[in-house]
C-alpha cells in the first residue's frame, strides 16, 4: 500500500532491511515476496535481517516460493556491530546496534555525493558541445576558440547536499546513540511511551518521545520523525 501511495514501482525495490524479528516488523515479508513474484519480478532481491532468521527464511522460501521466477537471498546481519552492509552507486546502508528484547539494529541510509549541476545558460552562451558536459561536471574548465579559459565555477552550480536517513527502530533509550546518527537529514526514532511512563519504557526496552527528542537534539539532525506508539 505504501508503495502505491508513494507512486513507487515495485521494480525499484532491490533490497529489504529488517531490524529485528518481532512480528510487526517481519510478518509481511513473505506476502510481499509473493506479491513481487505474481507481478512478474525476475531480478534478484536481497533481504538483510538478523542472522538468527536465516534458517527460517530458507524454510519459508522453499515452502512458499517454489513457483517464483526470481532469486531471493538473505544476507545475515550481525546486530551487535556498526558496519556498512550495503553499497551501490548512489548510497550506503550502515547498521547501528540497538537495545531491545532480542537482537536488533537500526539502519542509516546515506546518499553519496553527486556531481554539480550544469548551467545550461552558460553552456549555450559559450557554445560548449554536449560531448564536454561530463568533463565540466567533473571539474574541467573550458577553453574557447580564441584561447579564453572559462573557469569551471562559471559553468556549474553546487550539487545538492547528500541526504541521510537514520531508522532507529525498537530500542530502549541509549544515551550515546546521538553520536551514531549525528547530523542526519531525517531521524526516525521509536517513541512507544510518553515521558510519564519512562520506567515502563525501560522495562520493555522501548523509548519515550522525550528521549527520542533528546537524541535528535544532541545529534543536530534536520528533522525528527516519531513512531511506534503504544495503544496505552
Where do the language-model regions lie?
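Active-site metal-binding motif and surrounding structural segment of the metallo-beta-lactamase
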Residues: 1-48, 76-78
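Metal-dependent phosphodiesterase/nuclease catalytic metal-binding core
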Residues: 78-226
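A conserved acidic, glycine/proline-rich C-terminal tail/linker
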Residues: 226, 230-232
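Conserved beta-strand segments of alpha/beta enzyme cores
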Residues: 46, 71-73, 92
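Phosphate- and divalent-cation-binding pockets in alpha/beta enzyme and binding domains
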Residues: 2, 28, 56-57, 176
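Short internal beta-strands
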Residues: 45-52, 223-225
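Short active-site segment of divalent metal-dependent hydrolases/proteases
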Residues: 23-24, 173, 231
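A glycine-rich helix N-cap at a beta->alpha junction
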Residues: 64-78
Amino acid at each position: 500500500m505504501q508503495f502505491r501511495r508513494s507512486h513507487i514501482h515495485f521494480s525499484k525495490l532491490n533490497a529489504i532491511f529488517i531490524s529485528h524479528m518481532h512480528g510487526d516488523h517481519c510478518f509481511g515479508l513473505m506476502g510481499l515476496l509473493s506479491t513481487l513474484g505474481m507481478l512478474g519480478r525476475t531480478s534478484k532481491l536481497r533481504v538483510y535481517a538478523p542472522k538468527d532468521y536465516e534458517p527460517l527464511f530458507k524454510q519459508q522460501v522453499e515452502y512458499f516460493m517454489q513457483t517464483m521466477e526470481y532469486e531471493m537471498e538473505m544476507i545475515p546481519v550481525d546486530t551487535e556491530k556498526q558496519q556498512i552492509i550495503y553499497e551501490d552507486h548512489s548510497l550506503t546502508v550502515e547498521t547501528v546496534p540497538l537495545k531491545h528484547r532480542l537482537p536488533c539494529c537500526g539502519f542509516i541510509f546515506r546518499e553519496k555525493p553527486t556531481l554539480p549541476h550544469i548551467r545550461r545558460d552558460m553552456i549555450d552562451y559559450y557554445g560548449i558541445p554536449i560531448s564536454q558536459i561530463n568533463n565540466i561536471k567533473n571539474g574541467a574548465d573550458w577553453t574557447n576558440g580564441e584561447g579564453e579559459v572559462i573557469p569551471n565555477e562559471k559553468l556549474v552550480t553546487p550539487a545538492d547536499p547528500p541526504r541521510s536517513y537514520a531508522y532507529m527502530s525498537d530500542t530502549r533509550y541509549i544515551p550515546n546513540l546521538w553520536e551514531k546518527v549525528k547530523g542526519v537529514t531525517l531521524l526516525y526514532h521509536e517513541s512507544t511511551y510518553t515521558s510519564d511512563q519512562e520506567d515502563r519504557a525501560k522495562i520493555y526496552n522501548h523509548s519515550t518521545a522525550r528521549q527520542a527528542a533528546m537524541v535528535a537534539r544532541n545529534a543536530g539532525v534536520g528533522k525528527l520523525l516519531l513512531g511506534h506508539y503504544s495503544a496505552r
